[in-house]
Amino acid sequence: MPRQFSLENTRNIGIMAHIDAGKTTTTERILFYTGRVHKIGETHEGSATMDWMEQEQERGITITSAATTAQWKGTRINIIDTPGHVDFTVEVERSLRVLDGAVAVFCAKGGVEPQSETVWRQADKYKVPRMAYVNKMDIMGADFFNCIKMMKERLQANPVPIQLPIGKEDNFQGIIDLIEMKAYYYMDDLGKVIEQRDIPEDMRELAEEYRTNLLENVAEYDEELMMKYLEGEEITEAEIKAALRKGTIAVKAIPVLCGSSYKNKGVQRLLDAIVDYMPSPVDIEAIKGVSVDGETEIERHASDDEPFSALAFKIMSDPYVGKLCFFRVYSGKLSSGSYVLNATKGKRERIGRLLMMHANHREEVDMVYAGDIAAAVGLKETTTGDTLCDEANPVILESMNFPEPVIHVAIEPKTKAGQEKMALALQKLAEEDPTFRTYTDQETGQTIIAGMGELHLEIIVDRLLREFKVEANVGNPQVAYKETIRKSVKSEGKYIRQSGGKGQYGHCWIEIEPKERGTGYEFVNKIVGGVIPKEYIPAVDAGIQSAMNNGVLAGYPVVDVKVTLYDGSYHEVDSSEMAFKVAASMAFKEGMKKADPVILEPIMKVVVTVPEDYMGDVIGDLNSRRGRIEGMEARAGAQVIHAYVPLAEMFGYATALRSRSQGRGVFSMEISHFEEVPKNIQEQIISGRAKNNSSDE
């Protein structure tokens, strides 16, 4: 199948916004006008095409970024819908990574809300060209000009309005196009009948002022235009558009449009602007990668003639075709049925079917080209962030970094029969989502799930029930403590049972010493002259390790100790591996009690970004959580606080930060190291553990 749209006529864009700015509704309207959906879906009716997971339709928020292909005026537009909730930042990160440009949707009333700041900073990180669409111009309190002001102040952006609204709230009737200097009025409900008129008299002056602002702005991106402007010559529409496109792609200007997606006003203009100002794959820098040995940097240009390279950015389980792998083609072309190399894993993969995705149906294609976003069926080894490439020309593209999970809870199926089903389901979900982990707790034997926040884990539990029919009980979030010692001791362990028949005899002397934090366990055998025969030495080591699984203070695993076996005795008949294992275990337990044992807790490295006004409050709160502030730095209208805080004190922090910063603060945390717990808290942990154990019995 030959290429339908040239690379120049391809746009890969994301639609990003705060929850409730009307992002999904805007995407729905785009699909309606580009002819892909016959009946418009409404989010609040729960029928929106892009929100295809059941929980999304119930909660009215977008969780998984669905990729959709649409066409407008001879251009193919691939749209990635991204979620706006802070627990799903990984979805936003991974979609920004494969886009060429983004449309930021703002609510005309709320303006730049906290999540918009977060997403904006993520887009800054990847240098993604953006345009802005001020939505909901028809609602009470809508204020286009305040929204522009907030973009300057909160995002340190350079917004360039190319439209002005005519009227607002109930009286929102249409827009003034500042490039054509004409007014457009919407005459019907579906926004298909539009009347062009002259700019109304009462808005003439304002339009002239914003037109001047627009010309001054675009003149900066084109020297010829600058000369024309300074000499007062006429500047054509085509010249303005070309210069603004240049500024947008260089991430220096943000074209701003307005409308009301729900009332079908302004969406076709938005589509025109996507074609006019958003980059094609050819406009952005060639993607960089490295050779498989990591030695040489390799570039791949957006061209069908270069060797094939693509990045897998999302894995999904599909009820009809199994595992779907979404990928962005950066160079070359790929046909279904062919073999590719997964360079990240060093594995060969066969591409089964190739699908172009509409939000809820799919179209099978036999070939995809540079710049396309598609999904493949049949990939066994590939996970999020992997590079797929031509076997003869391997390359590893820059992958995505995913944060470590910050919260974990125990989970168990409601029925014994559900155990295996649950394990399989959790494994599938972990394949789809790199920030979700599942493992078994060695001490309690419980299954633990870990993720980016409470909503994240709630949705996982919800999906277990809906998609995999597994009912599960979930515990409270827990901290994984450890135990260690502070001084060296010598200790004896004797296990002797000799009362008729085969006896038991094991006897050893060990020295236990503290080691540096994070260096683990070390066993040294210093037995000379065979006082303990060689074959029993591994049993002594095993006995010590089994005793280390449960420390003497509160039963947490023991870490960072060195144990030296230096003396003992044995009995020719009664000694056995079992006897030495028990003796060593007894020696360790007795010795640890005398070695000044302490509990260690995980310390998190916490980074909080808040607007300056809330800084004092946030720092005070971190201090009250036993936090150590390590430093601060100013960043685009906000302060970034670096601190170390015990994990035990961080539960419920997302909610606390939200209320202390009126929802404008964001934070990330990852494990840094383990540290001794203060004495008073150690006592609380020990008594809490004792209570739990007695209630379990």
Swiss-Prot record:
This is Elongation factor G. One of its GO terms (molecular function) is translation elongation factor activity. Belongs to the TRAFAC class translation factor GTPase superfamily. Classic translation factor GTPase family. EF-G/EF-2 subfamily. The lineage of its organism: Bacteria, Bacillati, Bacillota, Clostridia, Eubacteriales. GTP binds at residues 17-24, 81-85, 135-138. Keywords: Cytoplasm, Elongation factor, GTP-binding, Nucleotide-binding, Protein biosynthesis. InterPro entries: EFG_II, EFG_III, EFG_III/V, EFG_IV, EFG_V, EFG_V-like, EFTu-like_2, G_TR_CS. The keyword Phosphoprotein does not apply. SUPFAM superfamilies: EF-G C-terminal domain-like, P-loop containing nucleoside triphosphate hydrolases, Ribosomal protein S5 domain 2-like, Translation proteins. GO terms for biological process: ribosome disassembly. One of its GO terms (cellular component) is cytoplasm. It comes from the Bacteria. It is found in: Cytoplasm. Catalyzes the GTP-dependent ribosomal translocation step during translation elongation. During this step, the ribosome changes from the pre-translocational (PRE) to the post-translocational (POST) state as the newly formed A-site-bound peptidyl-tRNA and P-site-bound deacylated tRNA move to the P and E sites, respectively. Catalyzes the coordinated movement of the two tRNA molecules, the mRNA and conformational changes in the ribosome. Residues 8-282 form the tr-type G domain.
